[in-house]
C-alpha cells in the first residue's frame, strides 16, 4: 500500500514487470521495481541480474516492494542486488522497500564492488532491512567498496543484520545518513568491527528531523554501533541516542562509537548541535564505554546525557563514558543545553572479584589534553563521575575553564560542576569515586566552577579571572602541585558542618595559596535558614588553606567580614563573623565562621495570609445574605409568606507585592418568612447555609461550611417633602419613606490544607463568626411615565457595619507546626444608590436595575500573630487591604405566577481597585 507520508513525489509511471529503460541522452541504466517484484518465501527466489554499467544503475520503485524469506530453505548464491562497475542507486519515489529474513549465504543483500562508486538509497517512505543476512556467514546488509549514502527517506530501520567481518548493517569507504526523519539501527552484529556501521573513511549522520537510534548493536572488536578511522560528524539531529551497544572481545574499545586511526592526521569526532543526545548503558572492554576516539569535539544543542556506560577490564579499564586516546584532545561545550555525566563506571578485575569505580572521562597519555571545557550562560556541565588521566607528568598547556573562543572575546558565563551528590553512601566512602584529575594549569576565565558533595579536583595550578566564581561545599578540596590564586571564593552555607571544611592545598615546595577579595556565603536552595538550628549561635570551622609553609599562605587582601550573596532571605536572620587561626604543625591557616541570630523573616509558605483573608470571605457571605433579604422584602407584593432562594458568591482579589491574591467561592440556600407586626411594620427572618472554598495564588486551600441568620425590620412612614425634593419626578407633598434595619449573624467552620514544597502537608481547623448591622432609608417614587424605560425609582442611603472574628488555632500533621492567634475584621461603609423599576402591563412582572456607590469610612484590616511552635518565633500575618471605594451594579427580575406564588432572581457585581465580586440568587415565595 502506498504510504500517506511522501518524502518525494511519486513517479507517474505504472507498476511494470522488471524492465529496462535506456535514455537516449545518457548511458545510465534505469530499472523499475514494483509490487510484481515482491516475493514471500519459502520457495525459489531469483535475484535481479547483476549489473555492470560503468555509468551507473538506478532502481526506481513504482510501488511498494516486499521481499521476505528469500533464501529459504536454500541459501541464495548471490546478493539480491549487485553492481560491479558503476554507481548503484535505489530511488523510492515515496514507496516502501521492505526486506526481511534474507539468507544470501556469505553475500550481502546489497553490494557495490566498484571502486570509488556510490551505493545510495533515497526517497523511500519506509526502508526496512531486518535480518537480511545469514546468521553465521553473512557479511552485512549493505556493502559498498565506495561511498554509501542513505538520504531523504522518511523512515529507515536496520535490525538484526549480521556480518562475519565488519559492519553488520552498512559498510562503505564513507557513509552518509542525511535528511532521514526517522532512523533506527537495532541489534545488528559484526564479528569484527562496527556492529551497525563500518567505514575506514568518514561517517556523517546529520539533519535527522525526528529521531535517530542505535540500540543493542554489537561488535567483537571496536565500535559496538559505529566504527570509523576518519573524521566524522554527528550533527544537527533533532534527537539521537546510543543505548546498550557493546563490544565483546578482549581489548575491544568504543562501546558505541570508535573513531581512531594509527596514521596521521588523527581523526576528529564531532558531535554538535543535536537537539537531544543520549549515550546510555553502552559497554566496552578496556576503554571508552560509550566513545573511544583520538579527538572529540562535543558541542551541545540540547540536553546531552552520558549515563550508566561502563568500561570493563581485568587490569586497567579506562573511560567509563569517554576515552581519549594517547596524544588526543577533548573539547566540551554546553552551548544549547546541559551536558551530564552520571552513573558511568570502570569495572576492574576478574568476574569473581571486580571493583566498580565511577568514571566519566579518561584522558590518554603522551600529551593528551583537554582544550575546551565551557558552558554558555544558563547551561551547565555536570560531572557526577570523576575525570581521570593516564598522564603522570603535568602538561604546560593551560586549560581556560569557560574560556573565550578567541583572545579578547568575552568569556563564557555558564557553570561547570564536579559533584558527588549522585553517589550512594558506599560509593561516597571510596576516594576514587570523588577525585578528578586534570594534569594541566587551570584558569577560571568566567562563569562558575562548583565543587560539591565531597569531591576533590586535582590540577597543576589554579587561578581565577575577575568576575568568575569558585563555589565550594564544605568537605571539598582543590589541590594543585603549583600555586593557587583565588579572588572570589563562595562557600555553600547548606554544606557547613562542624567536622567538614573546604580545602585549598598546594603540595609542592615554595608554592603559594593566595585568597583575596571577599569570602562569600550563598544559600543555593533558598531554604537553608529555615532550619531551626539557626535559632541558636553557630560556629563552623569552614575553610583550610595549606602550603609547605604558613608564610606561603596569603590572606592579607581578604576582606575581614564575610559577604552574604543573598542577604535578603527567608527564615532566620543573623550576622556572620570571620576569624583565622594559624597551625604551624599542619602548615595551614583555618577560617572559622560564627553565626549570631538577629531575627526571623517567614517564608511566604509559612505566612498564612489565607487565614486572615477568610475573614473577607465571611464578610462577603454575610453582606450578600443581607442584600438578598433586603431585596426580597422590597420585591414582595404581599406582606406575608415564606420563601426560599439559592445563592452563590464569587470574590477575587488580585495579587500585590505584599499579599498573595486569593479567591472565595460559596453557594447555598436561604429560607425566610415575612409578616406584618402592625399596619406599617414588616418583619422578615431568614436562615442560610453556605458551602465555600478559599484558595490563594500559592499553596493554601480552605473549605468552609457557614450558617447564618438574619432579622429584618421595615417601617413605612409619611413625611412632608422638602421643597427641593418636590421637583423630582413622581414627588408628592406627602412623601412615603421606608426605614429598614437588619442584623445578621454568621458562623463559619474552616478546614485548610497547606501544601508545603519542602515539608509534609499541613492541616488546620478553626471557626470564624461575626455579625453585620444595616440601617437604610429610601424614598419610593412610582409616578414616572409608563412610556419610559422605567416606571419607578428608589433613591436610598445606608449605613453598614460588619464585625468578623477569627478564632485562634494550631496547625497539625506537619514538621514545623504553626499557631495562629485570633484576629478581627471591622468594616463600616456608607452605600448611596438608586434603584429603577419597570412593571409589566398587568404588573405581574417587574424588572429593576440598581447602581450604588460605596465608601468604606472605617476599617480594621484582618491580621493575627503567627508563630512557629518549635522555637516560638512569631510574626504578624496580615490579610489583604481592599480598596476603600466600590461601585456596585445590580439587576433583578420578579414574576408572580399567581397571587400566592412569586419567583425572583438577582445578579450583582461589585468592582474595587484590585478586586471584584459577583453574586447571583434564584428562588420563590409562597404567600398566604
Curated annotation (Swiss-Prot):
Instruction: Report whether Nucleus shows up as a keyword of the record.
Output: no
Q: For the Autotransporter domain, which residue ranges apply?
A: 635-928
| Signal is among the record's keywords | yes
Task: Kindly indicate where the leader peptide sits in this chain.
Answer: 1-26
Q: Which residues cross the membrane?
A: none
What is the predominant subcellular site recorded for this chain? secreted
Q: Which SUPFAM superfamilies match?
A: Autotransporter
Q: How does it sit in the membrane?
A: Peripheral membrane protein
Instruction: Report the subcellular localization.
Output: Secreted, Cell wall; Cell outer membrane
Q: One GO CC term of this entry?
A: cell outer membrane
Tell me which SMART domains the record gives.
Autotransporter
Q: Which UniProt keywords apply?
A: Cell outer membrane, Cell wall, Membrane, Secreted, Signal, Transmembrane, Transmembrane beta strand
Family per record: Belongs to the PMP outer membrane protein family.
Cross-referenced NCBIfam families: POMP_repeat (TIGR01376)
Q: What is this protein called?
A: Probable outer membrane protein pmp9
The organism encoding this protein is Chlamydia pneumoniae
Amino acid at each position: 500500500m502506498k504510504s500517506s507520508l511522501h518524502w518525494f513525489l511519486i513517479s507517474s509511471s505504472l507498476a511494470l514487470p522488471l524492465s529496462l529503460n535506456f535514455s537516449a541522452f545518457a548511458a545510465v541504466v534505469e530499472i523499475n521495481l514494483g509490487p510484481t517484484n515482491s516475493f514471500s518465501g519459502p520457495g525459489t527466489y531469483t535475484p535481479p541480474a547483476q549489473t555492470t554499467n560503468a555509468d551507473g544503475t538506478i532502481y526506481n520503485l513504482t510501488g511498494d516492494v516486499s521481499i521476505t524469506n528469500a533464501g529459504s530453505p536454500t541459501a541464495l548464491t548471490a546478493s539480491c542486488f549487485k553492481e560491479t562497475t558503476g554507481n548503484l542507486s535505489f530511488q523510492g519515489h515515496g514507496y516502501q522497500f521492505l526486506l526481511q529474513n534474507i539468507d544470501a549465504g556469505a553475500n550481502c543483500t546489497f553490494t557495490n564492488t566498484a571502486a570509488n562508486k556510490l551505493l545510495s538509497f533515497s526517497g523511500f517512505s519506509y526502508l526496512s532491512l531486518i535480518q537480511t543476512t545469514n546468521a553465521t556467514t553473512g557479511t552485512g546488509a549493505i556493502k559498498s567498496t565506495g561511498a554509501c549514502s542513505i538520504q531523504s527517506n522518511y523512515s529507515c530501520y536496520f535490525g538484526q543484520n549480521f556480518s562475519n567481518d565488519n559492519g553488520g548493517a552498512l559498510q562503505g569507504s564513507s557513509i552518509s545518513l542525511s535528511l532521514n526523519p526517522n532512523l533506527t539501527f537495532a541489534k545488528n552484529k559484526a564479528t569484527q568491527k562496527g556492529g551497525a556501521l563500518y567505514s575506514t573513511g568518514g561517517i556523517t549522520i546529520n539533519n535527522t528531523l525526528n529521531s535517530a537510534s542505535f540500540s543493542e548493536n554489537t561488535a567483537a572488536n571496536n565500535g559496538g554501533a559505529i566504527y570509523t578511522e576518519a573524521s566524522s560528524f554527528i550533527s544537527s539531529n533533532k534527537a539521537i541516542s546510543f543505548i546498550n551497544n557493546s563490544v565483546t572481545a578482549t581489548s575491544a574499545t568504543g562501546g558505541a562509537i570508535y573513531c581512531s586511526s594509527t596514521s596521521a592526521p588523527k581523526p576528529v569526532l564531532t558531535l554538535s548541535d543535536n537537539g537531544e543526545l543520549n549515550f546510555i548503558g553502552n559497554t566496552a572492554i578496556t576503554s571508552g564505554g560509550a566513545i573511544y576516539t583520538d579527538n572529540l569535539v562535543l558541542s551541545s544543542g540540547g540536553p546531552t546525557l552520558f549515563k550508566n556506560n561502563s568500561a570493563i577490564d581485568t587490569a586497567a579499564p579506562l573511560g567509563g563514558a569517554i576515552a581519549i586516546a594517547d596524544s588526543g584532545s577533548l573539547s566540551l561545550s554546553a552551548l544549547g543545553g546541559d551536558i551530564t555525566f552520571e552513573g558511568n563506571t570502570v569495572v576492574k578485575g576478574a568476574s569473581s572479584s571486580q571493583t566498580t569505580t565511577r568514571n566519566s572521562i579518561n584522558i590518554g597519555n603522551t600529551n593528551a589534553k583537554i582544550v575546551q571545557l565551557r558552558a554558555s550562560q544558563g547551561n551547565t556541565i555536570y560531572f557526577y563521575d570523576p575525570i581521570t588521566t593516564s598522564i603522570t607528568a603535568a602538561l604546560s598547556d593551560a586549560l581556560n575553564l569557560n574560556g573565550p573562543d578567541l583572545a579578547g572575546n568575552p568569556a563564557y558565563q555558564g557553570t561547570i560542576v564536579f559533584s558527588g551528590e549522585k553517589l550512594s553512601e558506599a560509593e561516597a566512602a571510596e576516594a576514587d569515586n570523588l577525585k578528578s584529575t586534570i594534569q594541566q594549569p587551570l584558569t577560571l576565565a568566567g562563569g562558575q566552577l562548583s565543587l560539591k558533595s565531597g569531591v576533590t579536583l586535582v590540577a597543576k595550578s589554579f587561578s581565577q579571572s575577575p568576575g568568575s566564581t569558585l563555589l565550594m561545599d564544605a568537605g571539598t578540596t582543590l589541590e594543585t602541585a603549583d600555586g593557587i590564586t583565588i579572588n572570589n571564593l563562595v562557600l555553600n552555607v547548606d554544606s557547613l558542618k562542624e567536622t567538614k571544611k573546604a580545602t585549598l592545598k598546594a603540595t609542592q615546595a615554595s608554592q603559594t595559596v593566595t585568597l583575596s577579595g571577599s569570602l562569600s556565603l550563598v544559600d543555593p536552595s533558598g531554604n537553608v535558614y529555615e532550619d531551626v538550628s539557626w535559632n541558636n549561635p553557630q560556629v563552623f570551622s569552614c575553610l583550610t588553606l595549606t602550603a609547605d609553609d604558613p608564610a606561603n599562605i596569603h590572606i592579607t587582601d581578604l576582606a575581614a567580614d564575610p559577604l552574604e550573596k543573598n542577604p535578603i532571605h527567608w527564615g532566620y536572620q543573623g550576622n556572620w563573623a570571620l576569624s583565622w587561626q594559624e597551625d604551624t604543625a599542619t602548615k595551614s591557616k583555618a577560617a572559622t565562621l560564627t553565626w549570631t541570630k538577629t531575627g526571623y523573616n517567614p517564608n511566604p509558605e509559612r505566612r498564612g495570609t489565607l487565614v486572615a483573608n477568610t475573614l473577607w470571605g465571611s464578610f462577603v457571605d454575610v453582606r450578600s445574605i443581607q442584600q438578598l433579604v433586603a431585596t426580597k422584602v422590597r420585591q414582595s407584593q404581599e406582606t406575608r409568606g415564606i420563601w426560599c432562594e439559592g445563592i452563590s458568591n464569587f470574590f477575587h482579589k488580585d495579587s500585590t507585592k505584599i499579599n498573595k491574591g486569593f479567591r472565595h467561592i460559596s453557594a447555598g440556600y436561604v429560607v425566610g418568612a415575612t409578616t406584618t407586626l402592625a399596619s406599617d411594620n414588616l418583619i422578615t427572618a431568614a436562615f442560610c447555609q453556605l458551602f465555600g472554598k478559599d484558595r490563594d495564588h500559592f499553596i493554601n486551600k480552605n473549605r468552609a461550611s457557614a450558617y447564618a441568620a438574619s432579622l429584618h425590620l421595615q417601617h413605612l412612614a409619611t413625611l412632608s417633602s422638602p421643597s427641593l425634593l418636590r421637583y423630582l419626578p413622581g414627588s408628592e407633598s406627602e412623601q412615603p419613606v421606608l426605614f429598614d434595619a437588619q442584623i445578621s449573624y454568621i458562623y463559619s467552620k474552616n478546614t485548610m490544607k497547606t501544601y508545603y514544597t519542602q515539608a509534609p502537608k499541613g492541616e488546620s481547623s478553626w471557626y470564624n463568626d461575626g455579625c453585620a448591622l444595616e440601617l437604610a432609608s429610601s424614598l419610593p417614587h412610582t409616578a414616572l411615565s409608563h412610556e419610559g424605560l422605567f416606571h419607578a425609582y428608589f433613591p436610598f442611603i445606608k449605613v453598614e457595619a460588619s464585625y468578623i472574628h477569627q478564632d485562634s488555632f494550631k496547625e497539625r500533621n506537619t514538621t514545623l507546626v504553626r499557631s495562629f492567634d485570633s484576629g478581627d475584621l471591622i468594616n463600616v461603609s456608607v452605600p448611596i444608590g438608586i434603584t429603577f423599576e419597570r412593571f409589566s402591563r398587568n404588573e405581574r412582572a417587574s424588572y429593576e436595575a440598581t447602581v450604588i456607590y460605596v465608601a468604606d469610612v472605617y476599617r480594621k484590616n484582618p491580621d493575627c500573630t503567627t508563630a512557629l511552635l518549635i522555637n516560638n518565633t512569631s510574626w504578624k500575618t496580615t490579610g489583604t487591604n481592599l480598596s476603600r471605594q466600590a461601585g456596585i451594579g445590580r439587576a433583578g427580575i420578579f414574576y408572580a405566577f399567581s397571587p400566592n406564588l412569586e419567583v425572583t432572581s438577582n445578579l450583582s457585581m461589585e468592582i474595587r481597585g484590585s478586586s471584584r465580586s459577583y453574586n447571583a440568587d434564584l428562588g420563590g415565595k409562597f404567600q398566604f
